[in-house]
From Swiss-Prot:
Xref: SUPFAM superfamilies: Class II aaRS ABD-related (SSF52954), Class II aaRS and biotin synthetases (SSF55681), YbaK/ProRS associated domain (SSF55826)
EC number: 6.1.1.15
Coiled-coil segments: none
Organism, as annotated: Synechococcus sp. (strain JA-3-3Ab) (Cyanobacteria bacterium Yellowstone A-Prime)
Similarity comment text for this entry: Belongs to the class-II aminoacyl-tRNA synthetase family. ProS type 1 subfamily.
Keyword Cytoplasm included in the entry's annotation: yes
Pfam families registered for this protein in UniProt: HGTP_anticodon (PF03129), tRNA-synt_2b (PF00587), tRNA_edit (PF04073)
Subunit structure, interactors included: Homodimer.
CDD domains in the cross-refs: ProRS-INS (cd04334), ProRS_anticodon_short (cd00861), ProRS_core_prok (cd00779)
Classification of source organism: Bacteria, Bacillati, Cyanobacteriota, Cyanophyceae, Synechococcales
Record's comment describing the protein's domains: Consists of three domains: the N-terminal catalytic domain, the editing domain and the C-terminal anticodon-binding domain.
Protein name per its UniProtKB record: Proline--tRNA ligase
Length: 609
């Protein structure tokens, strides 16, 4: 990597105002600082300063991957549809999530731009791995990925094109997979620490990559503007993405009702209105929520979920449960789960539905006879609802509710599931003395134990020591390189601009010449740049014919860790050394500059294992 650069010769343009397109401060600063330029929604050019940052992050990733025995390769970005159909994920990625760019070539063959590479790597393993003697294997790549986001936003955090490291491991057994998973866990921690980031590791939902039963953890960079909510205990014993989190809900209040009654409750279509009308706690109410599930065979299934009135539905957990029921409906996968609004309910072409007053036994007659609509409602009850006695719920009549109801008496208890959304203030399931707290995070890394999810449908196998054919055990491990760069900015900035961690800063030091027409200032600056570069210190030389104030503002904006200024103190044989992170400035003798910076940079790069 180039050790020194004149700023006057760089393609370098900064902006004084925040771009209208940017919402997050990190996005604004990357645009204003001349790091990125938008081509179209979700697609950005990485300009020279950011490219240096990305190269440094990539180098750190490579070093840590190589240290655990992973081998770098490069996989095709253009992938044939048949391998995605073989794994069973083509419809999931093109219809359900709809995030894959799909196209047809001139021969009419379906292709896709890879959002991920499990299919490609599994096919490669199927072709090349024959024996247990070849295992384990870990391959990784760093390359551009593509995802057709519905609403690209937040700059590099949710783009349609992004830089990512993805690794894949193959094993003879589950024990070997778990060992590599732990190796990756430790390597990811080292990567983020070396990049100077504060992070936490959380239990996570495996999504379409791992499936509902895969072990999975996310590496979250803590930031108030993060898209993901994290629930954690103060003692650090538990942390999870809210999609995966479990907890103990607060106990329900005692019911004042001892007999079953039907009451007139006009104008109480919501839990809040009903609780106020009856002067009871929402914890005594069973609310009944309608969803429509679409499976990959085209069948729509209406789901009625009963849950305690003070709780919210975790739709990720619900979707995972419905995915496990796919075989019941002669399907392979759930494609889509949608809250049933008025338009969807109308499409069922059945009896009118008493919205706001639905009971657990809503009749199946609300479903018309249609070819692709299951004739019976799938009824589920969250644990919070299943435990209630003498509860309040709808009556299937507009303007009326029932009180004093019980499962097994007025209503049959449906299949009991755990699909409530854990929330801050709940007690921790593992240690009820700990109360869950909340934070925001940006997902940077995600590791999965895939098990046999891909090897079985794609017939990727090996011969074991006994000569028997066995499926390959598999793991996958991703880290967003371009996301990491922006997350660092989101976590480390001030009112004046970016504060890059030393390890991933585009340059270690910027040398500012306040007055380029002063030959002494220029001469000293040139000598310092040469000496710093020779000592391995990456140096940006601001030799532009600009006002000193502009140069200082730009230096703060782009966040170079150290700034040297060849100003008035030259008469005393000194230059000013300012640290971007602290704002502290000192004057040091010119002959001590190299040694001082080497010492400071070495200290900043020394990260404990």
């Amino acid at each position: 990597m180039q050790r020194s650069q004149r700023l006057s010769q760089m393609l370098f343009v900064t902006l004084r105002e925040d771009p209208a397109e940017a919402e997050l401060i990190s996005h604004k600063l990357l645009l204003r600082g001349g790091f990125i330029r938008r081509l179209s929604p979700g697609i950005y050019t990485y300009l020279p300063l950011l490219w240096r940052v990305l190269q440094k992050i990539s180098d750190i990733v490579r070093e840590e991957m190589n240290a655990i025995g992973a081998q770098e390769c490069l996989l095709p970005q253009l992938q044939p549809a048949e391998i995605w159909r073989e794994s069973g994920r083509w419809d999931v990625y093109t219809q359900a999530e709809g995030i894959m760019f799909a196209l047809k070539d001139r021969q009419g063959r379906e292709q896709a731009l890879g959002p991920t590479h499990e299919e490609v790597i599994t096919l490669l393993a199927r072709d090349l791995i024959r024996s247990y003697r070849q295992l384990p294997q870990i391959l990784y790549q760093i390359q551009t990925k593509f995802r057709d986001e519905i609403r690209p936003r937040f700059g590099l955090l949710r783009g349609r094109e992004f830089l990512m490291k993805d690794a894949y491991s193959f094993h003879a057994n589950e024990e070997s997979l778990r060992q590599t998973y732990q190796d990756m866990y430790r390597a990811y921690g080292r990567i983020l620490r070396r990049c100077g980031l504060e992070f936490c590791v959380v239990e996570a939902d495996a999504g379409a990559i791992g499936g509902p039963s895969a072990a999975s953890q996310e590496f979250m960079v803590l930031a108030s503007a993060g898209e993901d909510e994290i629930l954690y205990t103060p003692d650090g014993s538990y942390a999870a993405n809210v999609e995966k989190a479990v907890s103990l809900p607060p106990p329900a209040a005692d019911s004042p009702y001892t007999t079953f009654q039907v009451l007139d409750t006009p104008g109480t279509e919501t839990i809040e209105k009903l609780a106020n009308f009856l002067k009871i706690s929402p914890t005594l109410i069973v609310k009944n929520v309608l969803y429509q599930a679409l499976y990959d065979n085209g069948l729509r299934v209406v789901v009625l979920l009963s849950i305690r009135g003070d709780q919210e539905v975790n739709e990720v957990k619900l979707a995972n449960h419905l995915n496990r029921l796919a075989e019941r409906y002669q399907a392979n996968k759930l494609l889509k789960l949608t809250l049933a609004d008025a338009e969807i309910q109308k499409s069922w072409q059945g009896d009118p539905i008493p919205v706001g007053y639905i009971a657990p036994d809503l009749p199946d007659s609300c479903l018309g006879r249609q070819k692709n609509l299951a004739p019976q409602i799938l009824r589920l009850a969250d644990q919070t609802a299943a435990l209630l006695k003498n509860f309040v719920t709808g009556s299937n009549q507009v303007g009326r509710h029932v009180v004093g109801a019980n499962w097994g008496e007025q209503y049959p208890l449906a299949e009991v599931v755990d699909v409530r959304k854990a929330q801050a203030g709940d007690r921790c399931l593992l240690n009820p003395d700990q109360i869950l707290e909340t934070a925001r995070g940006i997902e940077i890394g995600h590791i999965f134990q895939l098990g046999l999810k891909f090897s079985l449908p794609m017939r990727a196998s090996f011969t074991d020591e006994q000569g028997s054919e066995q499926p390959l055990w598999m793991g996958c491990y991703g880290i967003g390189v371009s996301r990491l760069a922006q997350a660092a900015v989101e976590q480390s900035h001030d009112a004046n601009g970016i504060i890059w961690p030393v390890a991933i800063a585009p340059y270690h030091v910027v040398v500012v010449v306040p007055n380029v027409s002063d030959p002494e200032q220029t001469k000293v600056a040139e000598k310092l740049v040469q000496e710093l570069a020779a000592a391995g210190i990456e140096t940006l030389w601001d030799d532009r014919d600009e006002r000193a104030g502009v140069k200082f503002k730009d230096a703060d904006l782009i966040g170079i860790p150290y700034r040297l200024t060849t100003g008035r103190s030259l008469k005393q044989g000194k230059v000013e050394l300012a640290e971007r992170a602290t704002g502290q400035a000192v004057e040091i003798p010119i002959e001590e500059v190299v040694a001082t910076l080497k010492e400071r940079i070495a200290a900043a790069l020394a990260v404990p294992d």
